[in-house]
């Protein structure tokens, strides 16, 4: 598939290509995402359910919704969305991630449309979705505004985008770079570039410039004793997640 690479940072892609086989190893190089996934999913599902008036306790609550997981990796978010009944497209510019994602979905009995493509290429193809999951991606792209604008164009009017990233401050440098990559060695050194992190105010401004309406944001806070993540209304100092609507 031809991919428009306007916002793709090839050096960032190479990092994740090298780790592709480990996506579904909860003790491997993607352990931080496995630990974070429950709180990410809680936020995502509640926001989508609220936007579309869905009851999460009902069978297949997202049936009839078309959801894009951009930068899908091995499918850690795409698979739960499919289990909730959504029609899911998983897109990744790192082609090496996709065989892992496809194989795991097949073994799990899930139908997910995984594609080696980019946000810009999907826009050019005229694709649109009820929701776009844009989780831990924006800090890896070459042009955040162009990328977020493409993501906005992929939303149907009234659609919702969930976007998570890392704040840029001394605490995030200490925890996400020094702690995670050098001390705890949860991630390979160089996985993140602290200079590409975005403060909540910076991300809000970019979302607005892209034509989106930010409606919610929460911090995601890690407790090293319990090894669990939780949502916070106040602490957005390291990881945080936002919800934005494309105006109808």
UniProtKB/Swiss-Prot annotation:
It catalyses: a 3-demethylubiquinol + S-adenosyl-L-methionine = a ubiquinol + S-adenosyl-L-homocysteine + H(+); a 3-(all-trans-polyprenyl)benzene-1,2-diol + S-adenosyl-L-methionine = a 2-methoxy-6-(all-trans-polyprenyl)phenol + S-adenosyl-L-homocysteine + H(+). PANTHER family: METHYLTRANSFERASE, UBIQUINONE BIOSYNTHESIS O-METHYLTRANSFERASE, MITOCHONDRIAL. Its EC number is 2.1.1.222, 2.1.1.64. This is Ubiquinone biosynthesis O-methyltransferase. S-adenosyl-L-methionine binds at residues 40, 71, 92, 135. Keywords: Methyltransferase, S-adenosyl-L-methionine, Transferase, Ubiquinone biosynthesis. NCBIfam families: UbiG (TIGR01983). Belongs to the methyltransferase superfamily. UbiG/COQ3 family. Signal peptide: none annotated. It comes from the Bacteria. Pfam families: Methyltransf_23. InterPro entries: SAM-dependent_MTases_sf, UbiG_MeTrfase. Pathway: Cofactor biosynthesis; ubiquinone biosynthesis. CDD domains: AdoMet_MTases. It comes from Dinoroseobacter shibae (strain DSM 16493 / NCIMB 14021 / DFL 12). The keyword Transferase applies. GO terms for biological process: methylation. The gene is ubiG. The keyword Cell inner membrane does not apply. O-methyltransferase that catalyzes the 2 O-methylation steps in the ubiquinone biosynthetic pathway. GO terms for molecular function: 2-polyprenyl-6-hydroxyphenol methylase activity; 3-demethylubiquinol 3-O-methyltransferase activity; polyprenyldihydroxybenzoate methyltransferase activity.
């Amino acid at each position: 598939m031809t991919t428009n690479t306007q916002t793709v940072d090839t050096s960032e892609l190479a990092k994740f290509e090298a780790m592709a086989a480990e996506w579904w190893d909860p003790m491997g190089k993607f352990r931080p995402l496995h630990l974070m996934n429950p709180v990410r999913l809680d936020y995502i599902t509640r926001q989508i359910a609220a936007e579309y008036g869905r009851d999460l306790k009902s069978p297949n609550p997202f049936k009839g919704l078309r959801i894009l997981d951009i930068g899908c990796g091995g499918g850690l978010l795409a698979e739960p969305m499919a289990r909730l009944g959504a029609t899911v497209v998983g897109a990744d510019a790192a082609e090496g991630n996709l065989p892992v994602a496809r194989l795991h979905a097949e073994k799990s009995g899930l139908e997910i449309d995984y594609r080696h493509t980019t946000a810009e290429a999907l826009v050019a193809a005229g694709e649109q979705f009820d929701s776009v999951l844009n989780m831990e991606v924006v800090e890896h792209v070459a042009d955040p505004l162009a990328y977020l604008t493409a993501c906005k164009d992929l939303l149907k009017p009234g659609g919702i985008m969930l976007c998570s990233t890392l704040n840029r401050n001394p605490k995030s440098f200490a925890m996400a770079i020094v702690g995670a990559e050098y001390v705890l060695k949860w991630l390979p050194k160089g996985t993140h570039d602290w200079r590409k992190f975005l403060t909540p105010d910076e991300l809000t401004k970019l979302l607005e410039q892209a034509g989106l309406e930010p409606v919610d944001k929460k911090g995601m806070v890690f407790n090293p004793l319990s090894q669990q993540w939780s949502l916070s209304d106040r602490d957005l100092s390291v990881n945080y997640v936002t919800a934005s609507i494309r105006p109808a």
